[in-house]
Protein backbone atom coordinates (compact mmCIF):
# COMPACT_ATOMS: atom_id res chain seq x y z
CA UNK A 1 0.00 0.00 0.00
CA UNK A 2 1.05 3.64 -0.30
CA UNK A 3 1.55 3.82 3.47
CA UNK A 4 3.90 0.82 3.39
CA UNK A 5 5.89 2.35 0.53
CA UNK A 6 6.09 5.62 2.46
CA UNK A 7 7.44 3.72 5.48
CA UNK A 8 9.89 1.87 3.23
CA UNK A 9 11.32 5.22 2.10
CA UNK A 10 11.44 6.48 5.68
CA UNK A 11 13.20 3.37 6.97
CA UNK A 12 15.71 3.30 4.11
CA UNK A 13 16.69 6.88 4.88
CA UNK A 14 16.87 6.36 8.64
CA UNK A 15 18.84 3.14 8.20
CA UNK A 16 21.21 4.64 5.64
CA UNK A 17 20.43 2.09 2.92
CA UNK A 18 21.34 2.58 -0.72
CA UNK A 19 21.45 6.22 -1.75
CA UNK A 20 21.03 7.22 1.90
CA UNK A 21 24.27 5.60 3.09
CA UNK A 22 25.82 7.87 5.71
CA UNK A 23 22.96 10.39 5.51
CA UNK A 24 23.87 13.19 7.95
CA UNK A 25 20.22 14.02 8.69
CA UNK A 26 19.50 10.46 9.83
CA UNK A 27 22.70 10.32 11.86
CA UNK A 28 21.79 13.57 13.62
CA UNK A 29 18.24 12.37 14.30
CA UNK A 30 19.55 9.23 15.99
CA UNK A 31 21.49 11.41 18.42
CA UNK A 32 18.20 12.83 19.70
CA UNK A 33 15.43 10.31 19.07
CA UNK A 34 14.32 6.70 19.21
CA UNK A 35 12.01 5.65 16.39
CA UNK A 36 9.23 3.10 16.71
CA UNK A 37 7.85 2.25 13.28
CA UNK A 38 4.84 0.06 12.51
CA UNK A 39 5.23 -0.71 8.80
CA UNK A 40 1.68 -2.01 8.36
CA UNK A 41 -1.08 -1.46 10.89
CA UNK A 42 -3.63 -3.49 8.93
CA UNK A 43 -2.07 -6.62 7.41
CA UNK A 44 -5.53 -8.22 7.17
CA UNK A 45 -6.74 -5.33 5.06
CA UNK A 46 -3.65 -5.43 2.85
CA UNK A 47 -4.21 -9.12 2.09
CA UNK A 48 -8.00 -8.88 1.74
CA UNK A 49 -8.07 -5.57 -0.13
CA UNK A 50 -9.87 -3.71 2.66
CA UNK A 51 -8.96 -0.06 2.97
CA UNK A 52 -9.82 0.34 6.63
CA UNK A 53 -11.01 -2.86 8.24
CA UNK A 54 -9.26 -5.92 9.62
CA UNK A 55 -10.55 -9.51 9.31
CA UNK A 56 -12.87 -8.93 12.30
CA UNK A 57 -14.52 -6.00 10.51
CA UNK A 58 -13.07 -3.31 12.80
CA UNK A 59 -12.16 0.04 11.24
CA UNK A 60 -8.75 0.28 12.89
CA UNK A 61 -8.71 4.06 12.75
CA UNK A 62 -11.87 4.26 14.86
CA UNK A 63 -10.67 1.97 17.65
CA UNK A 64 -8.07 4.08 19.47
CA UNK A 65 -10.16 5.37 22.36
CA UNK A 66 -11.06 1.88 23.60
CA UNK A 67 -9.45 -0.89 21.54
CA UNK A 68 -10.69 -4.42 22.11
CA UNK A 69 -8.01 -7.15 22.13
CA UNK A 70 -10.38 -9.48 20.26
CA UNK A 71 -11.88 -7.04 17.75
CA UNK A 72 -8.86 -4.79 17.15
CA UNK A 73 -5.72 -6.53 18.48
CA UNK A 74 -3.51 -4.45 16.18
CA UNK A 75 -4.60 -1.19 17.79
CA UNK A 76 -4.60 -2.69 21.27
CA UNK A 77 -0.97 -3.87 20.97
CA UNK A 78 0.38 -0.67 19.40
CA UNK A 79 -1.51 1.56 21.83
CA UNK A 80 -0.18 -0.43 24.80
CA UNK A 81 3.38 -0.11 23.47
CA UNK A 82 2.99 3.65 23.01
CA UNK A 83 1.66 4.02 26.55
CA UNK A 84 4.60 1.95 27.86
CA UNK A 85 7.23 4.02 26.01
CA UNK A 86 5.67 7.47 25.71
CA UNK A 87 5.39 9.51 22.54
CA UNK A 88 6.88 12.85 21.47
CA UNK A 89 5.82 12.79 17.81
CA UNK A 90 3.33 10.58 15.97
CA UNK A 91 2.48 10.12 12.31
CA UNK A 92 -0.39 8.02 10.97
CA UNK A 93 0.15 7.42 7.26
CA UNK A 94 -2.90 7.03 5.00
CA UNK A 95 -4.26 7.37 1.50
CA UNK A 96 -7.33 9.42 0.65
CA UNK A 97 -9.55 8.15 -2.17
CA UNK A 98 -11.20 11.51 -2.88
CA UNK A 99 -8.64 14.30 -2.45
CA UNK A 100 -5.81 14.23 -5.03
CA UNK A 101 -3.24 15.90 -2.78
CA UNK A 102 -0.58 15.14 -0.18
CA UNK A 103 -1.54 16.85 3.09
CA UNK A 104 -1.69 16.44 6.84
CA UNK A 105 -4.59 16.60 9.27
CA UNK A 106 -3.76 17.69 12.79
CA UNK A 107 -5.55 17.76 16.12
CA UNK A 108 -6.47 21.43 16.24
CA UNK A 109 -10.18 20.63 16.67
CA UNK A 110 -9.52 19.15 20.11
CA UNK A 111 -10.11 21.35 23.17
CA UNK A 112 -6.81 20.03 24.59
CA UNK A 113 -4.78 21.25 21.56
CA UNK A 114 -2.10 23.64 22.82
CA UNK A 115 -0.15 26.59 21.42
CA UNK A 116 2.96 24.42 21.64
CA UNK A 117 1.34 21.73 19.49
CA UNK A 118 0.23 24.40 17.00
CA UNK A 119 3.79 25.77 16.71
CA UNK A 120 5.20 22.26 16.21
CA UNK A 121 2.55 21.47 13.61
CA UNK A 122 3.21 24.69 11.68
CA UNK A 123 6.98 24.11 11.82
CA UNK A 124 6.56 20.56 10.50
CA UNK A 125 4.31 21.72 7.66
CA UNK A 126 6.76 24.43 6.58
CA UNK A 127 9.74 22.06 6.78
CA UNK A 128 7.95 19.30 4.87
CA UNK A 129 6.93 21.71 2.10
CA UNK A 130 10.63 22.52 1.71
CA UNK A 131 11.60 18.83 1.80
CA UNK A 132 9.10 17.62 -0.80
CA UNK A 133 7.35 19.47 -3.63
CA UNK A 134 4.62 16.81 -3.46
CA UNK A 135 3.50 18.12 -0.06
CA UNK A 136 1.22 21.15 0.31
CA UNK A 137 -1.07 22.74 2.89
CA UNK A 138 -3.68 24.48 0.75
CA UNK A 139 -5.99 21.50 0.27
CA UNK A 140 -6.98 18.99 2.93
CA UNK A 141 -9.62 18.28 5.53
CA UNK A 142 -11.51 20.99 7.35
CA UNK A 143 -10.50 21.08 11.02
CA UNK A 144 -14.14 20.44 11.88
CA UNK A 145 -14.29 17.13 9.96
CA UNK A 146 -13.81 15.07 13.12
CA UNK A 147 -15.43 16.27 16.31
CA UNK A 148 -17.73 13.71 17.90
CA UNK A 149 -15.50 10.71 17.26
CA UNK A 150 -12.14 12.51 17.08
CA UNK A 151 -10.49 10.61 19.95
CA UNK A 152 -11.28 7.31 18.24
CA UNK A 153 -8.75 8.25 15.54
CA UNK A 154 -5.08 7.40 16.04
CA UNK A 155 -3.51 10.83 15.55
CA UNK A 156 -6.19 12.63 17.55
CA UNK A 157 -6.02 10.15 20.44
CA UNK A 158 -2.21 10.33 20.61
CA UNK A 159 -2.10 14.13 20.28
CA UNK A 160 -4.64 14.47 23.08
CA UNK A 161 -3.13 11.83 25.36
CA UNK A 162 0.53 12.81 25.01
CA UNK A 163 0.26 16.50 24.10
CA UNK A 164 2.65 15.96 21.20
CA UNK A 165 2.81 16.73 17.50
CA UNK A 166 0.47 14.11 16.05
CA UNK A 167 -0.57 14.13 12.41
CA UNK A 168 -2.37 12.02 9.86
CA UNK A 169 -0.57 12.24 6.53
CA UNK A 170 -2.73 11.58 3.49
CA UNK A 171 -1.53 10.66 0.00
CA UNK A 172 -3.63 10.46 -3.18
CA UNK A 173 -4.69 7.15 -4.66
CA UNK A 174 -4.28 8.13 -8.31
CA UNK A 175 -2.13 11.23 -8.69
CA UNK A 176 -1.13 14.45 -6.99
CA UNK A 177 -3.07 17.31 -8.60
CA UNK A 178 -0.36 19.79 -7.55
CA UNK A 179 2.40 17.89 -9.32
CA UNK A 180 0.77 15.43 -11.74
CA UNK A 181 2.72 12.75 -13.56
CA UNK A 182 0.71 11.68 -16.60
CA UNK A 183 2.91 8.64 -17.14
CA UNK A 184 2.79 6.96 -13.71
CA UNK A 185 0.47 9.03 -11.51
CA UNK A 186 0.95 8.45 -7.79
CA UNK A 187 2.82 5.21 -7.22
CA UNK A 188 5.03 3.32 -4.79
CA UNK A 189 8.18 5.16 -5.80
CA UNK A 190 6.60 8.54 -5.14
CA UNK A 191 5.25 7.32 -1.81
CA UNK A 192 8.72 6.06 -0.84
CA UNK A 193 10.34 9.34 -1.93
CA UNK A 194 7.86 11.23 0.24
CA UNK A 195 8.71 8.96 3.18
CA UNK A 196 12.41 9.60 2.66
CA UNK A 197 11.85 13.36 2.57
Where are these regions (language model features)?
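Active-site/substrate-binding loop(s) of hydrolase catalytic cores
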Residues: 1-151, 156-184
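His/Asp/Glu-rich mid-to-C-terminal helical/loop segments that flank catalytic regions of hydrolases
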Residues: 178-197
Amino acid sequence: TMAEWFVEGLVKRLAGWGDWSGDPVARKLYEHAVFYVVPNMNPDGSVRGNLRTNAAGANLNREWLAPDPERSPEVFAVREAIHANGCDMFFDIHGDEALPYVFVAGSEMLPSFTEHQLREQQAFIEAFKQASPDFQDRYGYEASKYKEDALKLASKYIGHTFGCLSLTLEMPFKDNANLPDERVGWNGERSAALGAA
